[in-house]
Amino acid sequence: MPRKAYTKQQEVLPDPIYNSKLVSRLINKLMLDGKRGTASSILYKAFDRIQSETGNDPVEVFQQAMENVMPVLEVKARRVGGSNYQVPIEVRPERRTTLGLRWIVQYARLRSERTMEERLSKEIMDAANGTGASVKKRDDTHKMAEANRAFAHYRW
């Protein structure tokens, strides 16, 4: 038990253009060295690109992408009798969104397109269509949990 009281998690304010907390959290994940202006500019340009290419509302496309990327199960290492077991556990809702955002940004950065706006928009569109590296990461995480299902009774 910690000696100090837990600090309350800071509330994320919705972004000014789309009025969405999820978009605001994506801006925070994109941000490097505290440059929020640069991060939001990249995101809004990526959303404009999504709007022009798909003709749909970019926030809806992004929410669909998040649904396809967020994991339901993951594995956690648990030491029992001198050996480590990968124990499958359910992912809490807050962690699901955090992992989804993290994977979308991480795999967008690894893409080969020229600009970050292009990489991010393509990754979001791919994720919304059920393809892309971030969706593959979710599938791999689920496969890992399924493969270690035998150790589910070690859950704590």
Curated annotation (Swiss-Prot):
GO terms for cellular component: small ribosomal subunit. InterPro entries: Ribosomal_uS7 (IPR000235), Ribosomal_uS7_bac/org-type (IPR005717), Ribosomal_uS7_CS (IPR020606), Ribosomal_uS7_dom (IPR023798), Ribosomal_uS7_dom_sf (IPR036823). The keyword Electron transport does not apply. PROSITE patterns: RIBOSOMAL_S7. GO terms for biological process: translation. Keywords: Ribonucleoprotein, Ribosomal protein, RNA-binding, rRNA-binding, tRNA-binding. GO terms for molecular function: rRNA binding; structural constituent of ribosome; tRNA binding. Signal peptide: none annotated. Pfam families: Ribosomal_S7. One of the primary rRNA binding proteins, it binds directly to 16S rRNA where it nucleates assembly of the head domain of the 30S subunit. Is located at the subunit interface close to the decoding center, probably blocks exit of the E-site tRNA. Belongs to the universal ribosomal protein uS7 family. Part of the 30S ribosomal subunit. Contacts proteins S9 and S11. This is Small ribosomal subunit protein uS7. It comes from Oenococcus oeni (strain ATCC BAA-331 / PSU-1). The lineage of its organism: Bacteria, Bacillati, Bacillota, Bacilli, Lactobacillales.
